[in-house]
């Protein structure tokens, strides 16, 4: 045996000969159960009592109920802005795709104006009109929630 093995063996022998203290009682009580069973009457499982005092989440205090309505309205506003942004991005992508297309060979006299000055319509494109309508809806909704 080496020196370290010998010292471990001697330590084990000394520890085996040491008297047992009251740290781990094994005596049985009057009811036939162990002392530990009396200390933990509901069982000795480690999770016993872990959820004791857990509050119910079914009922919310009135403070949170009032905030919930405001949060719903705020969420609706965000959804409106998101829809408007999607419409705008779609229009920008469509405009970008049109600008990257090579020009078609047309005589100069046959070019159509982008808007008709007689009827005053600046938005002849259906997509531009849709964008303006959605932005107006969002702004009207924003004005309605501000007051």
UniProtKB/Swiss-Prot annotation:
The keyword Lyase does not apply. Keywords: Amidation, Cell projection, Cleavage on pair of basic residues, Cytoplasmic vesicle, Mast cell degranulation, Secreted, Signal. Expressed in several dozen cells in the dorsal retrotrapezoid nucleus/parafacial respiratory group (at protein level). InterPro entries: Bombesin. Its main location: secreted. It comes from the Eukaryota. GO terms for cellular component: extracellular region; extracellular space; neuron projection; neuronal dense core vesicle; secretory granule lumen. One of its GO terms (molecular function) is neuropeptide hormone activity. Residues 1-23 form the signal peptide. The modification Methionine amide is found at residue 52. The keyword Signal applies. Residues 56-147 form a propeptide. Residues 98-113 have a biased composition (Polar residues). It is found in: Secreted; Cytoplasmic vesicle, Secretory vesicle lumen; Cell projection, Neuron projection. One of its GO terms (biological process) is response to external biotic stimulus. Belongs to the bombesin/neuromedin-B/ranatensin family. Stimulates the release of gastrin and other gastrointestinal hormones. Contributes to the perception of prurient stimuli and to the transmission of itch signals in the spinal cord that promote scratching behavior. Contributes primarily to nonhistaminergic itch sensation. In one study, shown to act in the amygdala as part of an inhibitory network which inhibits memory specifically related to learned fear. Residues 95-123 are annotated as: Disordered. This is Gastrin-releasing peptide.
């Amino acid at each position: 045996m080496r020196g370290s093995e010998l010292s471990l063996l001697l330590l084990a022998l000394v520890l085996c000969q040491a008297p047992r203290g009251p740290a781990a009682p094994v005596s049985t009580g009057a009811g036939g159960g162990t002392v530990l069973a009396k200390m933990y009457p509901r069982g000795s499982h480690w999770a016993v009592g872990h959820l004791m005092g857990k509050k119910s989440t079914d009922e919310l205090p009135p403070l949170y109920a009032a905030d919930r309505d405001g949060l719903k309205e705020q969420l609706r506003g965000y959804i409106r802005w998101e829809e408007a942004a999607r419409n705008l991005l779609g229009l920008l992508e469509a405009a970008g795709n049109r600008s990257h297309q090579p020009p078609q060979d047309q005589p100069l006299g046959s070019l159509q104006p982008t808007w008709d000055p007689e009827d005053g319509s600046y938005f002849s494109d259906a997509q531009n009109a849709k964008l303006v309508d959605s932005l107006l809806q969002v702004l009207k909704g924003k004005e309605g929630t501000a007051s």
